[in-house]
Every structure is written in C-alpha cells, then in structure tokens.
Amino acid sequence: MARTTFLVSVSLFVSAVLARTVEYNLKISNGKIAPDGVERDATLVNGGYPGPLIFANKGDTLKVKVQNKLTNPDMYRTTSIHWHGLLQHRNADDDGPAFVTQCPIVPQASYTYTMPLGDQTGTYWYHSHLSSQYVDGLRGPLVIYDPKDPHRRLYDIDDEKTVLIIGDWYHTSSKAILATGNITLQQPDSATINGKGRFDPDNTPANPNTLYTLKVKRGKRYRLRVINSSAIASFRMSIQGHKMTVIAADGVSTKPYQVDSFDILAGQRIDAVVEANQEPDTYWINAPLTNVANKTAQALLIYEDDRRPYHPPKGPYRKWSVSEAIIKYWKHKHGRGLLSGHGGLKARMMEGSLHLHGRRDIVKRQNETTTVVMDETKLVPLEHPGAACGSKPADLVIDLTFGVNFTTGHWMINGIPHKSPDMPTLLKILTDTDGVTESDFTQPEHTIILPKNKCVEFNIKGNSGLGIVHPIHLHGHTFDVVQFGNNPPNYVNPPRRDVVGATDEGVRFQFKTDNPGPWFLHCHIDWHLEEGFAMVFAEAPEAIKGGPKSVPVDRQWKDLCRKYGSLPAGFL
C-alpha cells in the first residue's frame, strides 16, 4: 500500500490549525485467495482481502487513487468505490455508486477520489458500488480519528489491530450467483473477521493461522471498531467472558452503554470498549450469523500475559438457531430478479434465538445472572441529541413501501423496482438546461426531488410477508430514527444512524436537506439492491448546479463516462 502525507496550511481556521492531505493508492485486481480455507477467484485491493485500512484525522482531506487492473472475464471488470458513511458535502461526484454519481472506472484506467472530511470522525468503510462486486472481496475499513475524542478517557488502545471488519464470504462469484436466480445460493458459505475464517469450523483447528487474533494485556482497555461488510449477513457480536461498552454507532458518538453482546446489520458499524480484566487465557470473539442457519464467524482474544504455549479457548464457540421467519425467507421462491442494464450508455452518450453448545460461561461470566443485548433504541447521541425536526412536524413526509414481486423476483419501493440509468443521475442534473423536474427521470430510475433546507421524514414499511430485517442505507446523510415498528416514537434522543433495520412493521427517520446531491437509498442486502430495492433522492438539484453548495466536477470525472461509453454494449 502506497501512502503519503503532507501538511497544508488552512487559513480558514481561526488559530492557524493545520490540516493534512492524506494520500492512498488502491490497486483493484483479480487473484486467488482462500480466506476460509477454500480457494476461489476474487476481487482484491492491493492484492488482499479485505483491503487495507484507510485512516485520517478530523479535518483532513483524503485523496485515494483507484487503479483498475481487473482482467477476469467471468467477473466484473469495471469498478466504482463508495466511501460508506462519508457525507461528501459539495462532493457528491466522489460518493461512488455507479450510474448515480459517476460512470464506472474502466479496466486499465484510474480515478482519484478527493474527499474533504470536515468535522466527521468515526468508523466507516469503503466498498465497490458496482453491481454486486463487493461481495467478491472489494471492501475495506476506513477510520477518521478525532484527536480530541470525547470518549478518550474510556480506552487505552485504538489502532489498526482493534479494527474488526467482519463479513460473509462466498465460494462462487457474485455474478454467477445472480445469473442463476436461485435465492438459496445467496446464503454465504462462511464468514470472516479481518479476512480469516473457517468454512468447516467443527473440523478445522482454531488457532492464529486460521482465525484473526487480537492480543491484549491485562488491565488495558481496547476500542474495537466493528464493521459489518456483508452482502446479507447480520451478526450477534460478543467476547467470551467479557463485557463491552458501546460508545459509537455508524460514526456517531453515543453515551456509554455497557452490554454483553450487540447485533450488527450489513453496512453498520459499532465501536465498543472491552477491558482485558479476566484471567490471562484465550477467549472466543463470537459472531454467529442471525439470518443464515448454521454459520458463524470467530476470532481469538489472547492475553499476552499468558506465558503458556498457545491453547484454544475453553468450551465451544457460539452458534445460533434462526427463527421460523428466517427459515421461511430462505425457502421462498421467486423469479430471476436481476436488474443490471447499463448497456445503452454508448448509444445514449457517445461523448432468532441463541443456541448454546456446551458451557454457559461462553456467554455469561461467572456469577452473572443476566445477559444484556444492546437495545438500539438506547443509542443516545453524545452531541446534539434530538430529532432533526425537533418537536415540530416534518416539513415533508414521504411514505415508502417495500415489497417483492414473487413472479419476477424484483424487490420494489412503492411498486417500482429500481434500474440503473445509462447516464449517471448527477450528470443528468448537471447537464439539464431548463430546470430539473421528476419528469426528467424514467420510472425505472425511480428518482424523487427533495427541496433544499427542509426537515424530511421517511416512513418506510413493507408488505413482503417475509420476516427478514432489511438494512436501509441513505447516502449523504445521517438520520434520526424516531420510531421502530409500532413502538412509541422518540423525538427527544433518538438513535442517529446511516443504516437502520426495517421489517414489514416499518421504521421512521428524519434528516435535514442541507447537502445537495443525488443520494442513493437502498437495502444493504446486496442481492436485494441488485433486484431493485433502491431509489434516488435528488436533493436540491438547482443547488447542485450552482451556488455556495454546488457540486463542482473536474475533467477526470467527465472522462469516466467518455471512457465507459467507448466500451462494447453490455460490458460491466
């Protein structure tokens, strides 16, 4: 990994504060890897999976040069990178979703994403946002450190070793899985933590060669930054014999909240402090999948104070018995729902319940009588708590109903399955000459215009009849989740996220339209996104084109579409 930093004086700050420009080079290529012991072709970042940690400090500017060296004709050969959770103020052109904010990067070309970080801090991640490509390995962690972190007194260690990127893993390429239309193939074969896992954990030794190992010293406190980079899997995370104190969710600092375990959906991040206060030994880091049967991820926590040779943890790891609703989901039948498109650009543009195996102290420390699982509704923001609209009604309420067409296999919002346009939404807005209206977008683009400087509430419900939780992600914003299902609303101190779980019972959240850009809203189950579970909100389109919050684009951004338009029709 190539990385350089240099200091740039920023005269806009009062007291001559210095901000850095932090540069990275990411080479995207194909290669064979076996993170769970089974070899397959994958899409790699700098030769590995997951990609390297990208990190910077509050106020820095990130410059990431992405080089496309993809060659495998059986996998996706163009690419595009999304920086999940970065707000991208005046910078929507570098948000990354293909055909929303940019054209893909073609093979043997490069593109440099330049991203001023402003006041953002916290745990994020980056991944391909071209079709289902990130399922094949193109994903990695991203952390923005805060030199004045309000939680700094709660932990001693916060470094690259305490970043845990967890994710499901497949032995078949995502392109091949989608081509079959067989939903059962969307179940992952295994899961990894920091690129290590066991396909057959009952018959594969648990040791530092097969599992990620976090070494700790007794008496020290460690800030874990847990990232769920999955295509579908949700996990329940715990550490054998240890409690954790949650201090952030999706990059938002929260009031400290002590738990024994927490659930984490695809796309979400949880920061939690664990104190190494047990007897020096080896302990399981457990992460059973909660929406896929008989799959689990593990890592090892080893005390450096333990002078004995390596020995595995006492007792088996945790497993999970999925609910009847999850079993029903994996048994349901639907048609082929792939909505790829993109082939016409050249012509258009030219230019459940826990199942414990073995000793109960795997979950509960000795003498404990209860196990505390994180309640998401108790994640209170540390700074500026309260709903975006305050105690007043929202200026605009948008009702969104998701569901699935069991005949076609398409997931839909308000009856429309999203299909990526041939021309990126941002380019269409920037080249419009007579005022952007919703009629400028085709029905499959499913694009709604949001007025600027309003408080908006999304009311999202489902009618699929399938009991799976959909992780809903909105680009360009964090939002305040004011109601989960039929629970009482909370406008005083609701959780603030950028990914929230939605069932058919629904979820409501609020945000202010203070960031002009075309922002993608979609299910972060990548299979559902590919089957149409998405739409675009064109926020303040006239402000995108001109004014103090406009989105300036450069020649290299424009060249992306020129180069992509020269590819053969259907090349992706």
From Swiss-Prot:
The keyword Oxidoreductase applies. Cu cation 2 binds at residues 84, 127, 524. GO terms for cellular component: extracellular region. In mycelia, at a lower level than LCC4. Binds 4 Cu cations per monomer. InterPro entries: Cu-oxidase-like_N, Cu-oxidase_2nd, Cu-oxidase_C, Cu-oxidase_fam, Cu_oxidase_CS, Cupredoxin. Homodimer. Belongs to the multicopper oxidase family. Lignin degradation and detoxification of lignin-derived products. This is Laccase-3.
